[in-house]
């Protein structure tokens, strides 16, 4: 795997991405203009401590992602520290936004390569981290659905009735991704299918690259999945990360005094919201979440209320997190400048 796969975002691309982010934010604010009075009134009710509590829960997400990276990378680099894991988490969050969703893994690979992890294993481990995340999202939403399916069926109308269909489509995609990582049978099937690519130089080069990535992924998945205690730790951290994220809308609703929805009901709705957002297009993590949030929570809150909750939710889970990741990213660069890369263990 070439070192081109691991890179830092350039200043030019970062500036363009920030302008796109600003434009998207302006579009979202414009769509909220008819309910701006309700939104500002709801936000004005919040105390300083309530705002700080919501922001703290939002910041916990990238911190726990860093903990997951720490646990995963230590399977290859036993000397990999928690601080370095947090650096990887910040690099992923920052890279995902400033490259409009395309650069989280390359930025993480750049950091991991600098601390001594070869690019191939690094790419395999970061892909497996993504697979663990998607698997946990699927399991979390499935458990919530099984426990509260009767309540959801009795309280959904309109487009929400299509939610099971969307769930099934996304579930199939996630299961296929998991099987590609862990099943030798599916990996062999993928190799066979790649043989049908056009016999041109361009496509054959792509085929060679994909086969190399598939081989690395197969090797790293066997190594990681053989360590059952480590896998359980990863799943536990992923579940805790999602639990905190799914608590955010409940805190927003409660602090604003907007709805009688119960804690576990909001957990269900938020897990489904995140699940549905995976099937929607997004730019730098924006667009899909907002659409899915309005779709899911719009059946349980008034229009102005759901927009108020969405506004605070995105401030805590996206904008403040991105601002923190910018600081974390530059601190990570300082850490790299202060160390010599260790040898692989």
Language-model regions, residue ranges each:
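Membrane-interface helix starts
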Residues: 13-16, 45-53, 222-236
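Membrane-water interface at transmembrane helix exits
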Residues: 29, 40, 69, 73-77, ...
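Transmembrane helical segments that form the transport core of multi-pass membrane transport proteins
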Residues: 221-272, 280
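Transmembrane helix-loop-helix hairpins in multi-pass inner-membrane proteins
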Residues: 1-41, 92-204, 282, 286-345
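Membrane-helix interface segments
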Residues: 10-11, 47-49, 78-87, 117-119, ...
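Hydrophobic alpha-helical transmembrane segments
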Residues: 51-55, 82, 86, 123, ...
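Membrane-embedded helical hairpins/re-entrant loop segments and their flanking transmembrane helices
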Residues: 64-94, 252-269
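A short amphipathic helical element positioned immediately N-terminal to and/or at the very start
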Residues: 37-45, 213-226
């Amino acid at each position: 795997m070439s070192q081109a796969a691991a890179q830092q975002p350039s200043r030019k691309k970062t500036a363009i991405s920030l302008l796109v982010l600003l434009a998207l934010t302006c579009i979202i604010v414009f769509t909220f203009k008819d309910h701006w009075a309700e939104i500002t009134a709801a936000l004005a009710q919040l105390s300083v401590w309530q705002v700080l509590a919501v922001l703290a829960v939002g910041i916990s997400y990238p911190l726990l992602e860093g903990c997951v990276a720490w646990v995963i990378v230590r399977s290859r680099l036993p000397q990999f520290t928690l601080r370095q894991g947090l650096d990887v988490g910040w690099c992923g969050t920052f890279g995902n936004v400033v490259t409009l969703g395309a650069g989280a893994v390359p930025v993480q690979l750049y950091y991991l390569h600098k601390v001594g992890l070869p690019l191939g294993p690094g790419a395999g481990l970061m892909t497996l981290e993504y697979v663990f995340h998607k698997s946990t999202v699927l399991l979390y939403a499935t458990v919530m659905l099984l426990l509260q399916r009767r309540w959801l069926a009795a309280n959904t109308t309109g487009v929400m009735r299509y939610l099971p269909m969307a769930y099934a489509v996304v579930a199939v995609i996630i299961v296929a991704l998991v099987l590609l990582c862990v099943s030798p049978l599916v990996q062999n099937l993928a190799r066979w299918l790649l043989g049908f690519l056009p016999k041109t130089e361009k496509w054959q080069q792509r085929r060679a690259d994909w086969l190399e990535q598939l081989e690395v992924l197969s090797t790293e998945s066997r190594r990681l999945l053989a360590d059952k205690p480590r896998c359980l730790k990863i799943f536990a951290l992923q579940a805790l990360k999602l639990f905190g994220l799914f608590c955010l809308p409940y805190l927003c609703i409660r602090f604003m005094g907007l709805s009688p929805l119960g804690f576990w009901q909001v957990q269900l709705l938020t897990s489904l919201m995140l699940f549905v957002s995976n099937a929607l297009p997004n730019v730098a993590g924006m667009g899909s979440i907002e659409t899915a949030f309005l779709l899911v929570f719009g059946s349980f809150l008034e229009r102005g209320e759901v927009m108020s909750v969405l506004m605070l939710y995105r401030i805590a889970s996206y904008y403040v997190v991105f601002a923190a990741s910018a600081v974390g990213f530059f601190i990570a660069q300082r850490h790299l400048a202060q160390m010599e890369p260790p040898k692989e263990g």
